[in-house]
């Protein structure tokens, strides 16, 4: 696999590899974590579209499986929420013309990651100095005065790019 900038960096620590979207390191981490266990974790995080788990390989971390932006944003919001997943919902409450509540969403949150793991991932994704070798100083991923965790990605052949970002109170993709 190639990195987006076509540069191979050799050994690199996980913080810098994740912050800079180093593809070779991502494949190694998936290999060490185990594909099936990683797919279970992805499902726990809210990624529902990876249904036929036997069709994926190590290139899954490079876009080898179709995942909707809504699923990705939902999964990253779990990191923002210290490891607790709150399923996304389109309608919170339905009221009649008099304000009487007819139906109301009842959240069913679940802890899917240890808090220290979620906080470490958030810290890495918000580490602007760790991103700098790949994205530059105060790149478009930097938000002055705010700790914003950000992850980028590209589609095959680099035709499209995406960005997910979050704070403890907001996740966008």
Where are the regions a protein language model picked out?
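Active-site-adjacent helix/loop patches that line small-molecule binding or acyl-intermediate pockets
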Residues: 2-47, 54-79, 124-127
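A penicillin-recognizing enzyme superfamily signal
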Residues: 16, 66-173
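Short coil/turn segments at secondary-structure boundaries
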Residues: 30-33, 40-45, 53-57, 87-92, ...
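Short helix-capping and inter-helix turn/linker motifs at the boundaries of alpha-helical repeat units
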Residues: 50-52, 112
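Short, surface-exposed loop/turn microsegments at beta-strand edges and helix-strand junctions
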Residues: 52-53, 166
């Amino acid at each position: 696999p190639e990195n987006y900038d076509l540069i191979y960096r050799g050994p690199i620590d996980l913080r810098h590899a994740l912050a800079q979207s180093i593809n070779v390191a991502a494949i190694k981490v998936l290999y060490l974590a185990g594909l099936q266990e990683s797919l279970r974790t992805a499902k726990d995080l809210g990624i529902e579209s990876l249904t036929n788990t036997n069709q994926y390989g190590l290139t899954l971390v490079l876009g080898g499986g179709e995942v909707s932006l809504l699923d990705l944003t939902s999964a990253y919001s779990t990191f923002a929420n210290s490891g607790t997943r709150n399923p996304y919902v389109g309608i919170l409450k339905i009221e009649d013309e008099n304000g009487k509540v007819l139906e109301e969403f009842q959240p069913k949150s679940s802890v899917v990651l240890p808090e220290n793991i979620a906080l470490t991932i958030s810290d890495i994704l918000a580490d602007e100095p760790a991103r700098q070798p790949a994205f530059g100083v105060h790149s478009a991923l930097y938000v002055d005065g705010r700790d914003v965790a950000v992850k980028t990605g590209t589609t095959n052949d680099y035709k499209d790019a995406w960005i997910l970002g979050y704070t403890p109170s907001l996740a966008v993709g």
